[in-house]
């Protein structure tokens, strides 16, 4: 029996909408990363973008477990400006209470996707919105009920 390898013309992409209200961030990011890669499909092919398009709404209401949401000493995100002594840091709590709370979900998913051009293409299929509105109604997305799959998903 030969290993199945999908062709680009055979790939069908679905649109999913996920409500992130009171959902644990790491569990959500892990599932979304697998769906963006297409690993939930039996026709998964590692070298092709066979994942689906994901819309996440209510990103500002995502939950972090433990002390990670603490704005003072919670989960720390580091970045570097490129200049000497340019290491900057911020916490997940500060990002969630700032102007762009959707960045926490995007960073969590991005760090679970492969770091190459295919991963960048797959990340372009992720749409995250801070509130409950999204402009993708024309694509007729299917609601993905993530909270009811496992009681640990919701907090």
UniProtKB/Swiss-Prot annotation:
A GO molecular-function descriptor: mRNA binding
Q: Which PROSITE patterns match?
A: RIBOSOMAL_L13 (PS00783)
Look up keyword ATP-binding and say if it applies: no
Q: Which GO terms describe its cellular component?
A: cytosolic large ribosomal subunit
Alphabetized UniProt keyword annotations: Ribonucleoprotein, Ribosomal protein
Q: Which Pfam families match?
A: Ribosomal_L13
What is one Gene Ontology biological process annotated in the Swiss-Prot or TrEMBL record? translation
Q: Does the keyword Ribonucleoprotein apply?
A: yes
What family does the Swiss-Prot or TrEMBL record give for this protein?
A: Belongs to the universal ribosomal protein uL13 family.
- Function, in words: This protein is one of the early assembly proteins of the 50S ribosomal subunit, although it is not seen to bind rRNA by itself. It is important during the early stages of 50S assembly.
The entry describes its oligomerization and partners as: Part of the 50S ribosomal subunit.
What is the official name of this protein in its record?
Answer: Large ribosomal subunit protein uL13
Question: Species name for this entry?
Answer: Rickettsia felis (strain ATCC VR-1525 / URRWXCal2) (Rickettsia azadi)
Q: What is the lineage of its organism?
A: Bacteria, Pseudomonadati, Pseudomonadota, Alphaproteobacteria, Rickettsiales
